[in-house]
């Protein structure tokens, strides 16, 4: 959408005031494959799943706070956990939520979640009685509690999912019977998902909204105009930097970024290390040395930060690592590796894929394409998939050379970083898509996740960052400046640690 058209919309149709029916309309750029975060990651699944399902905990300003579990105890070794569930909590069909459901849910996520490495150490999950659950791990897991939020490990109804149907294709992933603040009222596939307030929700007086409608705009250019005209109230994970400048000039609209500070979104190039070209760490090093990350960050709109290693800047676990920008040495490396330039100056051509709805990725790819061909004579042919599913099939099957991706570091490396490089998450979407495998790196990740001393843990993650950077496992590029664009009268979304990936039971409209 052009700036001129948006400017016209700004003055012709200001955003609406709070609605009479106490509802919220959230814009989506595509329809999610399902609503169950135990079997699929991604912002679309998680923002709806976090409303339909509860977790044992939710994230507060200082870490995990009670949610479905009203309290818990953890032993001094961080290996034994006991959870006490709230009395009277029910699923949306009225069935009581018990410790058996929680045990079932943890096991389901352990087997099926794309980030299953975060639960690898869980050894025993034992219901003591209907409202008490014991969990044991094989090694200390000081960060384990952070995993049990609804966007990662939702509490599922065992009486529905335990019917023998494979959970990753279960019809309840769309026709959800949840445990959270909102119940599924209706859906029109490809168009809308309507959630209604669940009157039996276990937190008194919550949720405060009566309805949330998720409306799909297949043309992302329609979303800014919908926000301006009041046809949508909120759009999360926006990277529409040009439009944001116009949004900020409208007093009825607010643009915020702080809610993504714990998600640590970033962009990287993932090499298929089974490809003969990218099997060589030296070739990967040459590509890294041919890109000036600072210049890239300045060229990409939106205020991104350059990134040189596996953990994004801004994370408390980030440790500075860098690869020097040295195109001359990059060319010498490629010469030694047996990739001379041909008569047209090209060393080799590879295809680079990207998730087709990720417009931010495409803007970076075009920059990288010009830099690679100019500095080292490597041609990256951009391949656009017909739809996100086609891209996902291609990268998980290994039928790709390089793919561009946008990932979240999440609030702990054991959740958001380990899964990208762990052997046990290879060929899983938004996890280890590169098929990288290194037993020493796996062991370092296990040691880091088990370290109870924060400084000792930070030192182990520093060693991991140095090791992965030395191998140039991926080409880390920059942070992503996601923003939430919303009607200014929508309250208690931006103050949630993960924004719309948190339960919106507190969200409400400002009233006169």
Model-derived features with residue positions:
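Detector for C-terminal structural segments
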Residues: 188-191, 197, 290-318, 360-370, ...
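Extracellular/periplasmic solute-recognition and catalytic clefts
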Residues: 126-127, 185-194, 215-275, 298
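Surface-exposed binding/hinge segments that line
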Residues: 73, 117-162
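Structural transition elements
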Residues: 272, 279, 305-337, 354-364
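N-terminal lobe/hinge region of extracytoplasmic solute-binding protein
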Residues: 27-76, 107, 119, 177-178
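A structural "hinge/loop" feature
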Residues: 30-46, 68-70, 95, 139, ...
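Gly/Pro-rich hinge or "lid" segments in bacterial periplasmic/extracellular proteins
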Residues: 62, 150-207, 211, 221, ...
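Aromatic- and charge-enriched surface segment that lines or borders ligand/interaction sites
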Residues: 71-115, 128, 134-136, 226, ...
